[in-house]
């Protein structure tokens, strides 16, 4: 039921006790366990297993202080035995793998080498660097060499990629070649096609192209990083100026934002139409995006009329949505602007709240770093596991574990000629190694819990600070000193358990969503329509559930900051308070978020326009200072995204301020009636907008 009038109530309760102590204890135990997990992973893990490729004997390629120190590249004796690039990268190709200092640069076979060796021994000197260390018998028969895999049967021109030698595929006039050849012969004088190499390493060409794009992007970042920093600094300054201007010109500025965004999107529509109209008359520009497929040169897409048509339609739908919202929700927009004006006034009294996101950022950076390092060490835990590799499909010992030291003394080599004991992967049969996957899930769950707790702590801190502003009768005289620090200490001292409780609920739902995404990825190639439909429904339901829990947690933290009760009680009271004001909540909350989103969009868009003219060298004054870029859109998108995130960090405080003031406003309406005996705490401007004028003393007495 609605709260009763309490003449002694003055905002956040100071006399409070610890809440959800059991969850607090559990949270502390989990953190200690998480530290223990990281320690165990650090002891058993070895990042070198991820950083360096490993040869058939389990030795790292390129590791300092070892015989392979100057051999940083992995070479495959017979790449034709490899089924796919995934097999290569997972180091499970059934052929000998050896560390080399460089990849082959020519076609050659062991048979040709033996013939040429009689006349020139330099052929063997070159070929033997791709043979097993210590092998120096070029007279050994081809059959025996291939059986024992002392040397590769052939070598092909290759280049290093992912620290592994892959065939150097080059497309010439639409034909796939290696060293300008489309065919070659192996050691058994069998004709081979370059297509077979491509099939053995399917997808390597596209990956290589992606690598080239990545290298060009890195070059762009290296040459213009300081311009990116300047752009982000401009976004920071604009965001601060924007927040300060809201204090004095909230109404004007917000209406300016609305119409500025409308004009900005309208300009985008006009520019897209102009580009579309020009390209429509250009020969060859009518090709569709699907026809050209993936291109490493991103400028190709900007030469297509369809690209600009897609941009134009997208911006047109955005423009229509904004205009329709303004037409049908203009009254709610006025109320939202009044709330934002009140929020700007509150922030002007508590400016320190704007810098609290720095603390959140530092804590999140620590959480992310610890999770990433723990995941890396867990993934690299385990001992070297060796398995029998045989080219004979009838070998019954194939894929069984083996020991390199005793392999030659077993019967496997007799029953399966040519079989070898090769390194397969890192793992183990101990209890720790068997539950690596479970430990990774635990690592992810605790990471999500800590991230959500960090965000919850920030929300509760900011809510407590702004609640003390709203419930102060005389502003700023009745606002307590250091409201942000006081609210932070209260939240951490008394309500760690409650914040951990709400964060855990959200973390569990997020973990379920991650698992569903993983299952969806695994079932992409499945033909079970019912399973796909069920999975799609579950993903949709849990997405909605996560959004609802986020909304309820946010309001529960506000109630915790004000009344100091446990999580369940605070969530229930917040829910009922919102339900009693459901008409206001349903529209006002989203309208306020929409206005703040427009502000973030305007800041990111404005900085983005400046960055566009800068990176395309269209500003004459500094044209010579700006480097020529391969893909100007990459640093441009970086500046736009970074500007949006910077604006979001400031506006997140603003949004929490408005949500807190709105909840306090709803309580104010229930506690007080505007009479002299029960005056409202809301500002005159907010009362005027809502039509809640003070009642006369005569009416209150009557």
Swiss-Prot record:
Q: Please give the biological process terms from Gene Ontology that the record holds.
A: choline transport; transmembrane transport
Principal localisation: membrane
In terms of InterPro entries, this protein maps to:
Choline_transptr-like
Q: Where are the transmembrane segments?
A: 21-41, 226-246, 250-270, 309-329, 335-355, 358-378, 444-464, 499-519, 594-614, 633-653
Protein topology in the membrane: Multi-pass membrane protein
CC per GO annotation: membrane; plasma membrane
What's the short name of a Pfam family annotated to this entry? Choline_transpo
Location comes to: Cell membrane
Q: Which residues are glycosylated?
A: 120, 173, 180
Membrane side Cytoplasmic: residue ranges? 247-249, 330-334, 379-443, 520-593, 654-699
Keyword Transmembrane in record: yes
Q: Is Cell wall biogenesis/degradation tagged as a keyword?
A: no
The record's similarity note reads: Belongs to the CTL (choline transporter-like) family.
**Protein role:** Choline/H+ antiporter.
This chain belongs to which protein, by name? Choline transporter-like protein 5-A
